[in-house]
Structures are given as structure tokens and as C-alpha cells.
Amino acid sequence: MLVILKETARKLGNVGDVLKVKKGFARNYLIPSGKAVRATRANLAILENSKEKLAAQQAAELETASELAKSFTEIDVLPIYAQAERGVLFGAVSAKQVVAELSKKGIEITTKNVVLGAPIKALGEHEVRIFLHSRVECSLKIHILDASRRGADGTITGTS
């Protein structure tokens, strides 16, 4: 079944792309969630009329994502504090925590942009991938530290 994407999907494509997908995927997920519409003659005509506007919008989004990616190069390691005992976390560090720490540094993204390879359940350094656009991705090192060793001023107390 041919569909036209109404929003960017990480592994599918960008807004305005005409894709051939399985009928069940289109009927059960893409169309009901508003991510795509059927590629009828009328919808293709509407797409054709708005191609220039769409191209300008995508170029602006790509430029914004590239600028945002440059701000990630300024961050060497992002510290995240979590409750731990004997080097093992009580829960996993989530994308929500990564987004919260980045917002403290003035970088605004959503949890949809952050991809954790596996649940982070141990102290130490971990790699996190950030998808800002279908063509722009970057990686970020995060350092998980024990929250009980964090001082009142934010510095680490004691020895490891």
C-alpha cells in the first residue's frame, strides 16, 4: 500500500515521502496514529502543490538539527546522578533523565530523540545516541554517578 508520510519517522522517512508499506502496518499504525495518509490521486495532488513549501521546511529543520548537533560537541561527558548500592542502580537510567540533564545545560530535546542501546543499570560511562533529524545523529557520553555521594554544592564527596 502506498502512503504519504505526514511527519518524520526515524526509520521510514521524512514528511512528504511516498512509501510502499505493508497494508497492516499502514491500516493499523501509520494511518490511525496520523503519521501517514493513503497515497490517493487527491492526496498526491495536494503533496505536489506543497512540495516547495515542504522542501523549505525540511531544509530549515535540517539546519536547526545541525546547529543543535554542534552544541553536543561542546559536552564532553554528561554527569547523571542516580541511587545506587555497590555499583548497581536501584532502577535504570531513562531517556527522561538524560533529557532533564541536557535541559539544565540549555539543550532542549525530547525523549523521542534519545536512544539508549540497552537499559542503563550500572554506574560508570555509557554511550547514548541522539537522533535530531533523519539525517542528523550524534552520540553523547554520560557518566552515571552515585547520588548518595553528591555534595550539597553538586560536587562528588568521598572516594570511588
Swiss-Prot record:
Q: Which Pfam families match?
A: Ribosomal_L9_C, Ribosomal_L9_N
GO CC annotation terms, alphabetical: ribonucleoprotein complex; ribosome
Domain of life assignment = Bacteria
Q: Which GO terms describe its biological process?
A: translation
Q: Which residues form a coiled coil?
A: none
What GO terms are given for molecular function? rRNA binding; structural constituent of ribosome
- UniProt keywords, alphabetically: Ribonucleoprotein, Ribosomal protein, RNA-binding, rRNA-binding
Summarizing the function annotation, the protein's role is:
Binds to the 23S rRNA.
State the family named in the UniProt similarity comment for this chain.
Answer: Belongs to the bacterial ribosomal protein bL9 family.
The name this protein goes by in its record? Large ribosomal subunit protein bL9
User: Which organism encodes this protein?
Assistant: Neorickettsia sennetsu (strain ATCC VR-367 / Miyayama) (Ehrlichia sennetsu)
Record gene name = rplI
